[in-house]
Amino acid sequence: MGRPPLAERSPYDRDRVVDVAVKVFTERGYDGTSMADIARALGVHKSSIYHHIAGKEQLLEDAVKRALNALHGMLGEPGATEGPSLDRLRYVVRRTVEIMVRQLPEVTVLLRIRGNTATERWAIARRREFDRAVQRIVAAAIAEGDLRSDIDTALVTRLIFGMSNSVTEWYQPGGRLSARDIAGAIDTVVFEGLRRRP
């Protein structure tokens, strides 16, 4: 069946175009997606998309900004900035998982980029800034005596995010586990293993 006539098509805006692009990126990969694929998923002519965005890389930028802005924004929340460093770290880990679940498609796109374009390199740099901010909290928790000091802070941060980031590969929205369940399990596994023993 062909495309519906223009008059019958539902209206769409930039956010809708980005939503659909994210879905196609997660299915086909960024490099494997063309503007024609996105237009087809929207049910419009490819030229119509250019009224909203400059091109595929702009769609990628908008998509990863959603995830990055949420993650960086969370670092400014009171739970991430106030109190003992261990409490702040636990808050950051839990909120990271919540953000990953809430923005699963955008986070999935963010975690799959490889640095092939200027936008991808920018996103990777921003992701590393986030990782370094968390690493500083890990170091502070060690300095305060709440975490073991025999494990490298960069390694601890990588292990925490390795576990957290895996959520994008197996989490099923509407499934048996909520974001809170997953965050709680990660919190227990990570912090019971890292806690300094008396």
Feature-to-residue mapping (PLM):
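Short secondary-structure transition hinges
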Residues: 58, 91, 97-136, 143
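Key DNA-contact positions within bacterial/archaeal DNA-binding proteins
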Residues: 47
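Short coil/turn segments at alpha/beta junctions that flank glycine-rich nucleotide-binding fingerprints
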Residues: 27-31, 82, 103, 144
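Hydrophobic/aromatic-rich alpha-helical bundle segments in the mid-to-C-terminal region
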Residues: 107-112, 120-124, 128, 142-189, ...
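Basic, helix-initiating cap at the start of DNA-binding domains
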Residues: 1-28, 32-44, 57-61
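Amphipathic, non-transmembrane alpha-helical scaffold segments
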Residues: 10, 18, 60, 64, ...
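Hydrophobic alpha-helical connector segments
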Residues: 62, 76-102, 157-160
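Base-recognition residues in the alpha-helical recognition helix of bacterial helix-turn-helix
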Residues: 26, 50-52, 62, 66
